[in-house]
Amino acid sequence: MEIAAVSTVSVAPQSRRVSNAFSRNLGSVSSLSFGFFEKEYCFKSPSLRVSAAASMDAVTAEKFSPASFLDKKETGVLHFVKYHGLGNDFILVDNRDSSEPKITQEQAAKLCDRNFGVGADGVIFAMPGVNGTDYAMRIFNSDGSEPEMCGNGVRCFARFIAELENLQGKHSFTIHTGAGLIVPEIQDDGQVKVDMGTPILKAQDVPTKLSGNKGEAVVEAELVVDGVSWNVTCVSMGNPHCITFGKKGGPNLKVDDLNLPEIGPKFEHHEMFPARTNTEFVEVLSRSHLKMRVWERGAGATLACGTGACALVVAAVLEGRADRKCTVDLPGGPLEIEWKQEDNHIYMTGPAEAVFYGSALL
């Protein structure tokens, strides 16, 4: 596999900027314009070749506009744009011409490798809509597995569609995901507000083998991990989440003290979670301010998890620890989460930003 990536670097101040929304967004990262490659840095491994272009002349910027770049039809070449939502980063692929992903799960895992690939938490495919939706979204995690959906990924997806369609200002889309219908709305300030639907609390639908102790829901139940009892609440946002505020009978968590790589996999692969689970470790700062670290199923420790932030607010409300509208601090930054009582829907608001675009020879 060979990868060519355009990096975000400064150019001379007299250079003319590209006028579309994509370049303006990248301009917030650095003074980037696209054009001729003056330098090329290459790295080779037995399985792929990575090259990054730097210091470019903007005179021919139009040749590297998002539309023209992603519309290229080259056999054996995958064009992509990398985005991130609070550091949760994804490779976005324009797959609107096919209902099958353009790469395999094995190829996606190679692309996501942070040492020998592009580096990402997952690959997201923008696909034709189904069942009357505008678009469909599929994701391959960095380990090649396929989750039902991803909250931060949905925000990146929405911004990606806006760039592809050259949409300006406020817009909303209907997206079919493995977790059902999701409706993101790009705000005037560029933030993305997403209607994440309703939480699933029935134990067998999360799924978890833990017995429901609050009706059919699992709330503050005991989960024994390596001989230690934790209080957990189980919530599905279309994908499974196990939320804990601390050990049974112990003080509230201080999440910065956790050895996440050690404890995270033990929750993910616990026998009580037949489909594995995402795990949120939560510290309560106030009734409207929560702090979390996450171990994601199939991706490990990440800087942010949108569905996890939604799930933990549900858990915090069910356990009486927080109100329905909260700021959730993640390692990559804050998300605004609201679980509305009127319709039982959860709304997530946060950023999504383009990083760079590139190509991979498959």
Swiss-Prot record:
Keyword Transcription tagged: no
| Metabolic or biological pathway | Amino-acid biosynthesis; L-lysine biosynthesis via DAP pathway; DL-2,6-diaminopimelate from LL-2,6-diaminopimelate: step 1/1
Instruction: State any single GO MF term.
Output: diaminopimelate epimerase activity
Q: Locate the coiled-coil region(s) and give their ranges.
A: none
Keywords noted in UniProt: Acetylation, Amino-acid biosynthesis, Chloroplast, Isomerase, Lysine biosynthesis, Plastid, Transit peptide
What InterPro entries does the record tag this protein with? DAP_epimerase_AS, DAP_epimerase_DapF
Top-level division of the source organism's lineage:
Eukaryota
The enzyme's E.C. designation: 5.1.1.7
* Protein residues bound to substrate: 88, 141, 151-152, 239, 278, 296-297, 306-307
The protein's matches in Pfam families, at most eight in alphabetical order, are given as: DAP_epimerase
List cellular component terms (GO).
chloroplast; chloroplast stroma
Span of chain positions assigned to the transit peptide in the UniProt entry: 1-52
Q: Name one GO biological process term.
A: lysine biosynthetic process via diaminopimelate
* Reaction catalysed by this enzyme: (2S,6S)-2,6-diaminopimelate = meso-2,6-diaminopimelate
**Which residues does the record list as N-acetylalanine (modified residue)?**
53
Where does the protein end up?
Plastid, Chloroplast
Q: What does this protein do?
A: Racemase that operates by a 'two-base' mechanism, which involves one active-site cysteine acting as a base to abstract the alpha-proton of an amino acid, while a second cysteine thiol functions as an acid to reprotonate the resulting planar carbanionic intermediate from the opposite face.
Q: What's in the misc comment field?
A: This enzyme requires no cofactors.
Describe the family membership recorded for this protein in Swiss-Prot or TrEMBL: Belongs to the diaminopimelate epimerase family.
Q: What is this protein called?
A: Diaminopimelate epimerase, chloroplastic
Which organism encodes this protein?
Arabidopsis thaliana (Mouse-ear cress)
Tell me the gene name. DAPF
